[in-house]
């Protein structure tokens, strides 16, 4: 059964609650045999994909952004509108397919994700101007990464039936 949550990317407290409470609770309930409702990811692939994104946001991993600055600015507007990511969205960084799994099983992948989330939530004092590269939006600051993680996390947790918008009548 999906946990029904409010969806408001512009509510900083709600985003923090999602990252601190909803995401860890949902990931804890995920089983390796849980099937996605759309897309081709397994449960472990989804968890490792989220870890990758959190690692980008802390500078633990790096990626290039192929888009010119003017296109990045247009794409970045998505971080501020209150629409969820579409189900059929294809990340250009994954056009060649999903990377190989890094962990032997879901429990290890889950632990790695939770550690990455903690690194994002409790960063070392690195100043307020620090930006890390996103593969679509370009360099993002902490607020923009928080918006990204909220939308991205909601998208993938919805993909596996772990969360749904409180106001979505169609959700189970």
Regions found by a protein language model. Give the residues of each.
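Extreme N-terminal tail/first-helix region
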Residues: 1-25
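Short, contiguous alpha-helical
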Residues: 33-85, 122, 132-172
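Short helix-to-loop capping/linker segments positioned immediately adjacent to catalytic or ligand/cofactor-binding
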Residues: 30-38, 100-103
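Hydrophobic packing residues in well-ordered alpha-helices of helical domains and bundles
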Residues: 20-23, 106, 110-113, 146-149
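Short, helix-capping/interhelical loops that line the mouth of catalytic, cofactor-
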Residues: 2-8, 59-113, 120-123
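N-terminus-centered regions that define maturation/targeting leaders and the start
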Residues: 50, 113-116
């Amino acid at each position: 059964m999906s946990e029904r949550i409010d969806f408001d990317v512009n509510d900083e407290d709600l985003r923090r609650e999602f990252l601190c409470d909803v995401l860890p609770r949902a990931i804890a309930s995920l089983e390796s045999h849980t099937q996605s409702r759309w897309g081709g990811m397994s449960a472990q692939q989804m968890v490792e994909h989220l870890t990758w994104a959190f690692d980008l946001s802390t500078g633990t991993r790096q990626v290039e952004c192929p888009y010119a600055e003017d296109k990045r600015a247009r794409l970045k507007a998505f971080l501020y509108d209150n629409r969820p990511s579409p189900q059929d969205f294809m990340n250009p960084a994954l056009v060649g397919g999903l990377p190989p799994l890094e962990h032997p099983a879901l429990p290890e992948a889950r632990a790695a994700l939770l550690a990455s989330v903690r690194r994002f939530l409790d960063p070392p004092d690195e100043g307020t101007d620090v930006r890390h590269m996103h593969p679509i939006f370009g360099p993002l600051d902490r607020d923009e990464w928080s918006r990204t993680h909220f939308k991205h996390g909601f998208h993938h947790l919805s993909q596996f039936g772990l969360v749904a918008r409180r106001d979505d009548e169609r959700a189970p």
